[in-house]
């Protein structure tokens, strides 16, 4: 992960929907440069931290021939690795700034004295970029799957459809 300057606003967390829309995505050869916010938005959590939407798992459910499926699995492995690194950094940030509870959990809430610092550092983390080293996966034109159109939009930097430019 590389450090980039960000425009963190104290007390304001960047929304994941805006990250998907404004994610910086740049393709150079086989490398795709994306923001950490884009990577985290591939698995959307609710306010309790439970994953509600997992676009990576949905990508895995596409009906493709095995010759394409292997490339999708390679892409998924790289995305999950990047996701886990960013999530570990988020957890480390919460653990360093949050309040330890009697049951061993660490909690950080908007009323916490460290909340503004967390938001600023988390926004910086989301604005950092990550290179994903992968070739673009070309799906056959007859690929089917639930939410296919949405997945094509979300994963556009990494996949395309045969015969479509």
What are these regions, as identified by a protein language model?
Residues 1-31:
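Short Lys/Arg-rich cationic patches that frequently serve as NLS/NoLS or arginine-rich RNA/DNA-binding motifs
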Residues 12, 64-71, 75-78, 82, ...:
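Non-membrane alpha-helical secondary structure
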Residues 19, 45-47, 164:
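Generic structural motif
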Residues 21, 61, 150-154:
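Generic detector of low-complexity/intrinsically disordered segments
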Residues 33-94:
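N-terminal interaction modules that seed assembly of large macromolecular complexes
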Residues 84-165:
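Low-complexity intrinsically disordered segments
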